């Protein structure tokens, strides 16, 4: 059963970043296990929903001399962790290459940049595709019916209560 208080994919799903990243931010924290897990999940999504997810290049401009090698080396480590699941190699970019990729970047003080690959997906379409798949396998989907409480018996969850926001009826 799927209960949604508003439109399907209209809440948190609609406010997502639309990125299916392999955990590059976790690399900065030194959390290698989480990077590996995120890379695995990214690969799974790109494989299972190629019509909804695709590789996307990112370019980080560098305005300080140390930024290109610093971020570039970290992103090369990201590539190494991705292994065969990598979406493209990290590239060190010259000033002119960076401006070609980012024509609206501030040219004053630009030293170069780094280009790396992650993923992007259509979150609303994915949520709807998953809901349709669940329905085709017998799940009940109800929108405009929010959960209002949980029913416990003998310390165990036994059910829930909900309210139909169109009729005002409680279930």
Roles of regions detected by a PLM:
Residues 114-171:
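Helical element adjacent to the flavin cofactor pocket in flavoenzyme catalytic cores
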Residues 6-7, 59, 148-149:
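Conserved beta-strand edge residues that scaffold enzyme active sites
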Residues 1-16:
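Glycine-rich FAD pyrophosphate-binding loop
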Residues 18-101:
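Dinucleotide-binding Rossmann-like beta1-alpha1 core, especially the glycine-rich loop
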Residues 16-20, 156-159:
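Short, conserved phosphate-binding/catalytic loop or strand-edge motifs used
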Residues 79-109, 113-129:
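Short linear elements at protein peripheries
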């Amino acid at each position: 059963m799927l209960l949604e208080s508003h439109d399907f994919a209209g809440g948190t799903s609609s406010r997502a970043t639309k990125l299916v990243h392999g955990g590059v931010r976790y690399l900065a924290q030194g959390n290698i296990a989480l990077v590996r897990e995120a890379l695995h999940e990214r690969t799974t999504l790109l494989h299972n929903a190629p019509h909804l997810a695709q590789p996307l290049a990112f370019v980080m401009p560098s305005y300080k001399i140390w930024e290109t090698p610093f971020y570039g080396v970290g992103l090369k480590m990201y590539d190494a962790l991705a292994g065969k699941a990598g979406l493209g190699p990290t590239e060190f970019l010259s000033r002119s290459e960076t401006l070609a990729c980012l024509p609206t970047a501030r040219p004053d003080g630009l030293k170069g940049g780094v280009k790396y690959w992650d993923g992007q997906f259509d979150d609303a379409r994915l949520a709807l595709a998953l809901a349709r798949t669940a329905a085709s396998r017998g799940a009940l989907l109800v929108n405009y019916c929010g959960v209002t409480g949980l029913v416990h018996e003998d310390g165990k969850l036994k059910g829930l209560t909900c309210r139909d926001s169109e009729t005002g009826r409680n279930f």
